[in-house]
Design a protein with these regions (language model features):
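Conserved SAM-binding loop
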Residues: 1-101, 111-128
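S-adenosyl-L-methionine-dependent methyltransferase catalytic module, highlighting the catalytic core
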Residues: 65-73, 83-183
């Protein structure tokens, strides 16, 4: 997992043969070394002398300068039939494009988000990095409860606060319909 943070995603992969993470922040590295010992953690991709079946990157790419160069480096570390799974926020998010919530815009376009991708821009940089057979799927990470938080409280965390009021089914239907807006 490239940009694995505290190792939460890797920690959930109980059936994996090996778990490897890349993370720059020392506090995260120390936490993983002390609390999540099954994860092999490194600070730099160059410190791995092996190839991987799968490389994941969740909400990391938008923080990186030189995205094509980094993607090329990741591609070199993939096995011949390896896959890379990338999750990024969409530049045309519902709360940006349809609702134009100023607070959400300020939250999303903070200084550490260097670029937000669209379908076209993500496919373009992946192609420039040498990836072929590119499949881009839309996924709505947060449901109605989270958006309700933005509409009412004008801040994140609605998925925590409103969780007890909004059923999983309503969240699922809402999220699926937002995905349809992008297709």
């Amino acid at each position: 997992d490239f940009g694995c943070g505290w190792g939460g995603f890797l920690d959930k992969l109980t059936n994996a043969k090996s778990l490897n993470g890349i993370e720059l922040r020392n506090e995260c590295i120390n936490f993983i070394k002390n609390k999540r010992k099954k994860i092999n953690i490194k600070k730099d991709l160059k410190n791995y002398d092996k190839e991987f079946d799968i490389i994941t990157m969740f909400h990391v790419l938008e923080h990186l300068p030189k995205q094509v160069e980094i993607l090329k480096s990741l591609k070199k570390k993939l096995k011949k039939k390896g896959k890379i799974i990338i999750e990024v926020p969409h530049a045309e998010d519902f709360l940006l494009e349809f609702e134009e919530l100023k607070e959400f815009k300020n939250f999303t376009f903070w200084s550490e988000h260097l670029i937000l991708h669209t379908h076209k821009s993500l496919k373009s940089i992946l192609t420039k990095a040498g990836f072929t057979n590119i499949k881009i799927e839309y996924f709505q990470r947060y449901g109605f409860d989270n958006h309700l938080g933005w509409f009412i409280k004008k801040k994140p965390g609605g998925h925590i606060f409103f969780k007890k009021y909004i059923s999983k089914k309503i969240n699922s239907i809402y999220s699926k319909n937002l995905v349809k807006l992008k297709k």
